[in-house]
């Protein structure tokens, strides 16, 4: 009975994770196919999760994360020191630069935006919070893996992720060179390979023992980035250092929960 209950819990977590990553409602049949589980079991489990408020269904029976997961998320962020300390820093960075700022981390074998403060622009130039992205496509990827050896980095990144959005392939050797070069400054920037419009800036946020635990980022139009590169870089590094100091203060008090 305990083993069956554990399998059910594993599948419930898998369903929540699938819906969060898909960023769209899904029918139970599609969920079953995606996680490779029997349809009957998934239908039964989804009904239970809906009754508990973990999932909600629209008029067509499409499922999406329930409001209880929203409340859990708010509670998590309230107690998550990195996110709690980062929000005012993001607000200040965007207010000072006029550009979209982000807090980014590694999630499994991908990069993701954890928090974002969007700039007041007529059109959106940034990605979605929580969307998994291949690490080599990102400026942050050159900073977030610096604590790993070359062998560990290449074992972590799926080989297909070195293929860029435009079809060209970034050599693993070149990626490692860029990563090690960025280490001394704790900063990296480049024109985003995901589109022809944006330039991405990333600065390391360090935690205990100086390890990079996250990155603070700016996303700006390429022309704006070229014209203001030095100023944007300086502001980003300053705010990343400020966030690192805030985290160090929490560590010193012995209360960091993340």
Question: How would you label these PLM feature ranges?
Answer:
Residues 1-79, 83, 241-249:
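N-terminal helix-turn-helix
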Residues 5-9, 66, 79, 83, ...:
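Short, structured helix-loop boundary elements
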Residues 18, 34, 85-96, 102, ...:
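Amphipathic alpha-helical regulatory segments at dimerization interfaces
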Residues 55-56, 103-104, 205:
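A structural signal for short hydrophobic beta-strand segments in well-ordered beta-sheet cores
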Residues 61-159:
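Amphipathic alpha-helical effector-binding/dimerization core
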Residues 155-160, 164, 240-258:
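Cysteine/selenocysteine-centered motifs that mediate thiol-based redox chemistry or coordinate metal-sulfur cofactors
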Residues 168-242, 249:
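Extended hydrophobic
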């Amino acid at each position: 009975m305990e083993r069956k209950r554990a399998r059910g819990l594993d599948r419930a977590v898998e369903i929540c994770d699938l819906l969060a990553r898909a960023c769209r409602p899904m029918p139970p049949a599609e969920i079953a196919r995606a996680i490779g589980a029997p349809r009957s079991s998934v239908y039964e489990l989804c009904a239970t999760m809906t009754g508990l408020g973990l999932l909600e269904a629209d008029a067509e029976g499409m499922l999406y994360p329930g409001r209880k997961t929203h409340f859990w998320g708010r509670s998590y962020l309230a107690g998550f020191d990195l996110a709690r300390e980062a929000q005012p820093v993001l607000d200040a960075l965007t207010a000072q630069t006029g550009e979209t700022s982000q807090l980014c981390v590694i999630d499994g074998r991908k990069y993701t935006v954890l928090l974002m403060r969007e700039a007041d622009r007529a059109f959106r130039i940034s990605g979605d919070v929580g969307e998994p992205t291949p690490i080599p496509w990102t400026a942050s990827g050159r900073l977030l893996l610096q604590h790993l050896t070359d062998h560990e980095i290449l074992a972590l990144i799926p080989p297909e992720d070195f293929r860029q959005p435009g079809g060209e392939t970034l050599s693993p050797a070149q990626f490692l060179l860029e990563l090690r070069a960025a280490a001394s400054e704790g900063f990296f920037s480049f024109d985003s390979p995901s589109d022809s419009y944006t330039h991405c800036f990333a600065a390391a946020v360090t935690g205990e023992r100086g390890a990079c635990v996250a990155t603070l980022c700016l996303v700006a139009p390429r022309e704006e980035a070229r014209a203001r590169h030095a100023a944007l870089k300086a502001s980003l590094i300053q705010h990343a250092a400020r966030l690192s100091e805030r985290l160090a203060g929490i560590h010193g008090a012995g209360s960091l929960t993340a």
